[in-house]
Amino acid sequence: MFKYFLQFIALGLLIGAPVIMAQSPVPAGAVVDKIAAGFQFVEGPLWHPDGFLIFSDIPASTVYKWDPATGNTSVFHKPSGNSNGLSLDLQGNVLLCQHGKRRVARRSSDGSESAVAETYQGKKLNSPNDLTVKKDGNIFFTDPPYGINSSQEELKFYGIFRYSPAGELVLLDKSLNRPNGICFSPDESKLYVNDSQALKIYVWDVQADLSIANKTLFYSMTGGGAADGMKTDTEGRLYSSGPGGVWIFSPDKKVIDKIAVPETVTNLNWGDTDYQTLFITAGVSVYSIRLNAVGAAVSAETDLMPQGFELAQNYPNPFNPNTTIAFTLSQATDIFAAVYNERGQQVYELTRHRYLPGRHQLAWTARDEQGKLLPSGVYFCRFEAEEQVQVRKMIYIR
């Protein structure tokens, strides 16, 4: 894993405006880690609810999976239709913006694909680029022409669209030259979209009928390069790819900080069990950095999760010596989990942490607190989630 010390550039020195550094979510002395490399052109990072990162390699027509436990990368979905942006629908299926197939598609859990949106008023879309899913299931996406040449264009404009759960495709705006990155404010009352080559970020008010209105210039970046993927955190800060790395803005349009990245940033997203890690796709590599912030609108499917929490049976079971314990939360919850032997003695503390809604995984290697391998036998995994307790029996065979 290659590490680059971040260069926290006071942007006020570059553009003549003051920077409110006190609000920066970037810890002093933080580092950006290169966690995967050697691809062709990466995009669309997405933290999967099963506890791993997926991302697109557009020219390779492949979605890759990065395992945080091992640091290894493997193929998640291929061919991907030259996918770019990725997201999740309400059921936890992966949504893909496919340049090659000129559509938004859905990948089911069995790996099969189905079209979500591919034509508007009988004409093919250009090449859907990025998307975000509202908590009610509506899919908002941008449709610039980056995946096609001008002779293939049928729409003759580059739109921002909404696809409803009922199957209706609605054009929201066609005023931008190259609409690209797209995301909501934490309360979903505002929609941010950037105009890539113009380096401008715009914001609209989301209306009760899900149209967008009151278009306003949020910020105009300077420097070489382009604007691309964007996300917000729970405090309403906006994170946008831009010249030199990731630009961080306060909700009132002030530049707070900039995360320097050694390659051209294409997109970014939140992940890890607490959603305080920002994953960044850039050039041929994927980077990550821990921040003093929590990602907003982590995934729409959390609204459909069971109330409280669910503890799954460990897998594999019986096991030797590695096993995985998965649990699902419907809301942010303080979790204490530990492993006990048959005499009721605690042998290992798995976690004592606050987790966001979603599916999470913990690993146990059949060792005690001192790292000593335990004897074969029956063990119990006990989870405490506020006022709820769940226990699962585990069988360890050496």
Give, region by region, the residue ranges found by the protein language model.
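A short helix->beta-strand "capping" segment at the edge of beta-propeller domains
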Residues: Q23-F39, K215
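Beta-rich, blade/repeat-based domains predominating
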Residues: V31, A37-F52, P79-R103, Q121-F141, ...
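Short, solvent-exposed loop/turn segments at conserved positions within beta-propeller repeat blades
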Residues: I58-P59, H99-G100, Y146-F157, S196-Q197
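A short loop-to-beta-strand structural motif that recurs across blades of beta-propeller domains
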Residues: T62-Y64, R103-A105, Y158-F161, K200-Y202, ...
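Short loop/turn segments that connect beta-strands within beta-propeller blades
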Residues: D67-G71, S108-S112, Y163-G167, V206-L210, ...
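Loop/turn-rich, solvent-exposed surfaces of beta-rich toroidal or solenoidal domains
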Residues: L199-K200, W204-V206, I212-K215, Y219-P251
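Glycine-centered coil/turn sites that cap beta-strands in beta-rich domains
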Residues: E301-Y315, F319-Y340, E349-R352, Q361-W364
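C-terminal tail/sorting-segment detector
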Residues: H353-P357, A363, K372-R398
